[in-house]
């Protein structure tokens, strides 16, 4: 019998989405195929420490969030003498070194899905699930992602960008620039956050300054986007021989939530109604699935991503909102739900993502790293 593939489920992270990651990781941990994979839970706590968590006694069936054990040994990532990735305890003797085959990052937000962890794994020559450094970085930045999408001919909603430096230097001028050419309401968003952290719907000029102050708590660059009377449509994309786009879903925030906020997503069990598949005609469904794969390709993504769009109620046109290269995998997350509705069950999806990561790593290892004339 072949040895099992050793999969590190990496969770936690130094970001505002730390708690979301714990929930996603519990679901991934529970659904990875134990006949093929040996699962190794490694957390990143809020101070940035990497720790191996012995969760063999965890009740997988009922764990809503993967814990970070207080006495878990701190580890560092290294390359073993055979070139294989290995986790080594910081304190000698605290744990045995753990050889690994692939890392499944189940982490969200800055210092997690923005290319930083991916760069570390590249340097360690370790296979990992999801997009590489470039795609992770540009996809995380809502401004850069929109610019690349526009360059590829994909419509986006009008928006403006402010930096914290400019805002601090001249608040009056920045407040005017923030809505120049836009009409209220607008949405204020940190450029490099997800899960709707730090997002505000601004309906009056008087509310703009406080919204910007809050958004700048999470990022040095903030996006101010035109509010549109639109439906929120999502598509899951999976890399295979060709790019596969799922059936689209539609998010309908309940009346007491003005938009799909962090509270609506994670704290309110009745925060939104989801239509899966979305109530689109055949032409609209084909159009949005095609746009999703075009965005995925334009940003040079790998593995998987969730692509979000607005469907303008007045014009009937789709416009790109944002892309998530490490989408949530909680019990209510739409990426696995859309894939399941499109014929790819959760467990099979995870296995395919691991296989894609290993294949991509083998391809990169086959490249020449030196040059002799």
Curated annotation (Swiss-Prot):
Q: In which pathway does it act?
A: Cell wall biogenesis; peptidoglycan biosynthesis
Localization recorded for this chain is: Cytoplasm
Look up the record and name the cofactor or cofactors this protein needs. Answer: Mg(2+); Mn(2+)
Signal peptide position in this chain? none
- Kindly give the Pfam families that the UniProt entry links to this protein: Dala_Dala_lig_C, Dala_Dala_lig_N
UniProt binding sites for Mg(2+) 1: 308, 322
Give any single GO term for biological process.
peptidoglycan biosynthetic process
Q: Paste the cofactor note.
A: Binds 2 magnesium or manganese ions per subunit.
Protein EC: 6.3.2.4
Q: Which UniProt keywords apply?
A: ATP-binding, Cell shape, Cell wall biogenesis/degradation, Cytoplasm, Ligase, Magnesium, Manganese, Metal-binding, Nucleotide-binding, Peptidoglycan synthesis
Q: Which Gene3D superfamilies match?
A: 3.40.50.20, ATP-grasp fold, A domain, ATP-grasp fold, B domain
* Gene Ontology terms: cellular component: cytosol
**GO terms for molecular function, please?**
ATP binding; D-alanine-D-alanine ligase activity; metal ion binding
Q: Where does ATP bind?
A: 179-234
Q: Where does Mg(2+) 2 bind?
A: 322, 324
Reaction catalysed by this enzyme: 2 D-alanine + ATP = D-alanyl-D-alanine + ADP + phosphate + H(+)
Span of domain ATP-grasp: 146-355
Q: Give the UniProt family note.
A: Belongs to the D-alanine--D-alanine ligase family.
Biological role: Cell wall formation.
User: Protein name, please?
Assistant: D-alanine--D-alanine ligase A
Q: Which organism is it from?
A: Bradyrhizobium diazoefficiens (strain JCM 10833 / BCRC 13528 / IAM 13628 / NBRC 14792 / USDA 110)
């Amino acid at each position: 019998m072949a040895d099992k593939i050793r999969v590190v489920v990496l969770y936690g992270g130094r970001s505002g989405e730390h708690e979301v990651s714990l929930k996603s990781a519990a679901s991934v941990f529970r659904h990875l195929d134990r006949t093929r994979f040996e699962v190794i839970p490694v957390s990143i706590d809020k101070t940035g420490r990497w720790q191996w968590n012995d969760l063999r006694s965890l009740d997988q069936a009922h764990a809503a969030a993967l814990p970070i054990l207080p006495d878990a040994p701190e580890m560092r990532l290294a390359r073993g003498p055979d070139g294989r990735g290995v986790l080594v305890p910081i304190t000698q003797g605290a744990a045995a070194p753990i050889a690994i085959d692939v890392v499944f990052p189940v982490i969200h937000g800055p210092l997690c899905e923005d290319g930083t962890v991916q760069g570390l794994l590249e340097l360690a020559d370790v296979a990992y699930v999801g997009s590489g450094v470039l795609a992770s970085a540009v996809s995380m930045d809502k401004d850069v992602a929109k610019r690349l999408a526009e360059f590829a001919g994909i419509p986006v909603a009008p928006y403006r960008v402010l930096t914290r430096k400019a805002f601090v230097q001249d608040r009056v001028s920045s407040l005017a620039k923030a809505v120049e050419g836009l009409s209220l309401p607008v949405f204020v968003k940190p450029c490099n956050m997800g899960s709707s952290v730090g997002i505000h719907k601004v309906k009056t000029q008087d509310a703009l300054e406080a919204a910007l102050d809050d958004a700048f708590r999470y990022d040095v660059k903030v996006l101010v986007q035109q509010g549109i009377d639109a439906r929120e449509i999502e598509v899951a994309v999976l890399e295979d021989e060709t790019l596969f786009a799922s059936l689209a879903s539609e998010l309908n925030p309940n009346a007491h939530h003005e938009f799909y906020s962090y509270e609506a997503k994670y704290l309110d069990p009745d925060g939104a109604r989801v239509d899966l598949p979305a109530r689109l005609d055949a032409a609209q469904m084909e159009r949005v699935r095609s746009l999703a794969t075009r965005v995925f390709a334009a940003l040079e993504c790998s593995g998987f991503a969730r692509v979000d769009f607005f469907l303008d109620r007045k014009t009937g046109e789709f416009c790109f909102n944002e892309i998530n290269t490490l989408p949530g995998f909680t019990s209510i997350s739409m990426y696995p739900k859309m894939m399941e509705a499109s014929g790819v069950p959760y467990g099979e999806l995870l296995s395919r993502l691991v296989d894609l990561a290993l294949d991509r790593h083998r391809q990169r290892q086959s490249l020449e790293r030196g040059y002799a004339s």
